[in-house]
Amino acid sequence: MSQTPSSPVPRGGGPSRLFILRPVATTLLMIAILLAGLVAYRALPVSALPQVDYPTIQVVTLYPGASPDVTASAITAPLERQFGQMSGLQQMSSQSSGGASVITLQFQLSLALDVAEQEVQAAINAATNLLPNDLPYPPIYSKVNPADPPILTLAVVSDALSLPQVEDLVETRISQKIAQVGGVGLVTLAGGQRPAVRVRLNGAAAAAYGLSSETIRSAIANANVNSPKGSLDGPTRAITLNANDQLRSAQEYQNLIVAYRSGAPVYLRDIASVEQGAENTQLAAWANNHPAIVINVQRQPGANVIATADAVLAQLPQLRESLPASVKISVLNDRTQTIRASVSDVRHELLLAVALVVMVIYLFLRNLPATLIPGVAVPLSLIGTFAAMYFLGFSINNLTLMALTIATGFVVDDAIVVIENIERHLENGDPPLRAALKGAGEIGFTIISLTFSLIAVLIPLLFMGDIIGRLFREFAVTLAVAILISAVVSLTLTPMMCARLLSQESLRRQNRFSLACERQFQRLIAGYGRALRLALRHPRITLGVAVATLMLTVLLYLIIPKGFFPQQDNSLIQGTVYAPQSISFSAMAERQRQLSEALLRDPDVASVSAFVGVDGVNPALNSGRLQIVLKPLADRRDRIDRIIPRLQALAARVGGISLYLQPVQDMTIDTLPGRARYPFTLQAMSLDELQTWVPRLQARLAQSPMLKDVNSDWQDQGLVAYVNVNRDSASRLGIAMQDVDNALYNAFGQRLISTIYTQSNQYRVVLEQERAHQDGLTALQRIYLTAADGSAIPLASIATVEQRHGVLAINHLDQFPSATLSFNVPDGYTLEQAIAEIDAARRAIGMPADMTLHFQGAALAFQSALDSTLWLILAAIVAMYIVLGILYESFIHPITILSTLPSAGVGALLALMISGQALDVIAIIGIILLIGIVKKNAIMMIDFALAAERTQGMAPHDAIYQACLLRFRPILMTTMAALLGALPLMFSQGVGAELRQPLGICMVGGLIVSQILTLFTTPVIYLAFDRLARNTHRPTRGVPAR
């Protein structure tokens, strides 16, 4: 029954009074929050994780035919010197291989990517004069992290057209359109077969005519030009000049006259074969074991994956229409599918958590009107949070949805506390309005203290450093906003609805089930009362249990295995293939094709794309890349951790290769794609030091059971033909070293000697020795040089050739020579143990002090997170102590409240150990949240005890005993609500479940143990501090949190 209009309005109500007395205004305010949240929800972007990336730029310079030494000294070093002067540069790594220089620049998180781009462009401009004059392509930079897997992989094939023709269509009609899409950072063509005219020189035939390869190169270059010719400007007309100065086809080049001998023309066809082919014949790609042009689309750092991929996919129908009917485009991999599936799973878990929480409320209250009130408050608080997320620039992702799922148990707590207190006054005979005002007035500041002390726990998360801190900022802020909105709803809508929906009649109206539940609950309260009296009579035992819990928490923290992030199953695997270092391209291509064919036999594999050849990603001819797309999780027999060993067993049947596989993760911290999950870099002053110590360290680590798949990118057994020119002999013949270099480059470097210009694209003319004359060292015997008198001189007459071993790639870290090793952690061991083992191995082999070891990517982030873990937890405790001390005006009572924390720590750590989980970053977040949850029990007890002492003059013993019994029901309800809110995360099985399970396990384990212990330890500690204060003659009574 509500108050009649003529009845005087009761006093009280605290901050809720206005909202209780103005139900229409309160209802409209809540509707506004609801609508704002719904509108924001539809506008929020979707992603796997918060968009947090280091500003990263990759600079690629191609120099076909150059050795790693030449690439490093002529291209990489000049560029590095300029890049090293840029402000905000955090790390610079480079890889100089045969024909390609790749420099990766990682900037500080605080630097905007556009600013970094301007600095890079300026540095490239400054280095231009220092680069080789015959460099066929200028340095090209891309706003992309090379370690970030493609968001889309497309395959383009044709039964009617050759691959060079398909490549030309892709370059002119597809790749440029995709690159124009907002958020796309880089579009690469794997297996690129750009059309070109290939001139394959017959050295012996040219020498017979007395022609050197340099003479032929000059003749071709001079015969194909595209330069301005001016115009004629007469009295009445203007005429533009043009000429047939370009040769556009292989046929035209065959008929090119390169010289005259005895008055007769020497055609190019007489001394070379000329054909229409590919610019680089040492590149190949396959899509599901069929030759193809594979398009990899990578996003810019910070770009939304789903928005970018959707924009690209939306263009595919139009792009297909622009291609001939024989050219087919297929999507091999779409990363958004697993991201959408993962987010969808978390949404379902969120809805399940809400349903479980409402069910718990009904079981405790056994009253539909009373259940309806928190049933409205929970979704309203969660939906309202979306509005704040939109204005803060957040996205709907795994972490923000996890925060909302956990918040389900938090936000209902406030409503439960308010409803339970108002019901108590109704049972005591107060009419609904009076009960609402009195109950809300009594509990209002308790709600405020609960809210601010819980938000205080989240404050340290906002100050976590580096990329991990940025990652969890959205999680912490989303959870804090949900808690804050919940407090507002509980102080406004909840008491207003109680005044209108609850009545003494509704409380008395109970069925048999309700009566049976109530009897059982009364027995439970009575049993708790007896156990509590026993604990209060034997305080030393209870205090001993509390101290033992604290000690056990410390012990468990020290011994529990520690990790970084759980390994996710995103249905995508990246593979790196390595063969013997001296393998030829054709042999490597055949093994890669065989491997692709073998992997496709696995029933859980949906598609395989494979690539070999040297480009901006692949460092050497003996390496290749794989991208393996698995079937959706629901359609597979096994999860990814079981599939990988199976695929490696299939690869073992293909002889002469090593295959390294690692699952693609949502969070990419590395800057270079590696063979294993955890990389570290050895940096030295010279390549000789690396040659000595890298194999030793790798061999030592390979023997350790704490690491597996130990490997390095150090390759120094490639075959090198060292041409030792007798300079004296060459000088007598009038042959310069430049002539020798040009002859070798013209023969074996796939030298780009001229450019064919068209309206839509540019094509190159490639000069090389005939393929049959490139089969070994004997090919050098067919090289001729032109002496000063015009005679043809064999290279062998002035030079000797020595076969040596050399490096296939030269790597730098911050301009110093380096080698990167990487490893995986076997089951039963942790990343913490593996890192300790690496440090021990380094000391054991006696590595010099001037060689430095730098952990990279995930290993580096783990070390940073591990170092800050204890400080993070301590900061959360200190923040909570300060807030509670201010609210209670006491130095003692916050300590009583914080004494509940060790029990939560024991429960969380034990749960992790029992389930076989490591204490990783996600689990640490769970422990920090537990700090905020479990202290609610103590706050509700102490707040009521202090109020009883102050207003009723009760003794501390009687006050805390009464407070424990009065608050037992809401304590049990709130704990069960939080526990069931975390339960869906604990038992999560969908895509990306590995990321969510540790959080749920921590929450459930910590809540169960803390619920059992704190009901007894908190009142005992409260009385112990009271006695201590009385014995020291200090005032003990703080004030309730008002």
Curated annotation (Swiss-Prot):
Lineage: Bacteria, Pseudomonadati, Pseudomonadota, Gammaproteobacteria, Enterobacterales
PANTHER family, per database record: MULTIDRUG RESISTANCE PROTEIN MDTB, PTHR32063
Family of this protein: Belongs to the resistance-nodulation-cell division (RND) (TC 2.A.6) family. MdtB subfamily.
Domain of life where this protein originates: Bacteria
Compartment annotation: Cell inner membrane
Keyword Cell wall biogenesis/degradation: no
Protein known as: Multidrug resistance protein MdtB
SUPFAM superfamilies assigned: Multidrug efflux transporter AcrB pore domain, PN1, PN2, PC1 and PC2 subdomains (SSF82693), Multidrug efflux transporter AcrB TolC docking domain, DN and DC subdomains (SSF82714), Multidrug efflux transporter AcrB transmembrane domain (SSF82866)
InterPro entries: AcrB_DN_DC_subdom, Acrflvin-R, Multidrug-R_MdtB
Quaternary context: Part of a tripartite efflux system composed of MdtA, MdtB and MdtC. MdtB forms a heteromultimer with MdtC.
Protein's membrane topology: Multi-pass membrane protein
Any one GO cellular component localisation term in the record: plasma membrane
Coarse class of the protein's main subcellular location: membrane
Coiled-coil region list: none
Keywords: Cell inner membrane, Cell membrane, Membrane, Transmembrane, Transmembrane helix, Transport
Residues that span the membrane, as ranges: 19-39, 350-370, 372-392, 399-419, 443-463, 475-495, 541-561, 872-892, 893-913, 914-934, 971-991, 1001-1021
Example GO molecular function: xenobiotic transmembrane transporter activity
Stored NCBIfam families: PRK10503.1, RND_permease_2
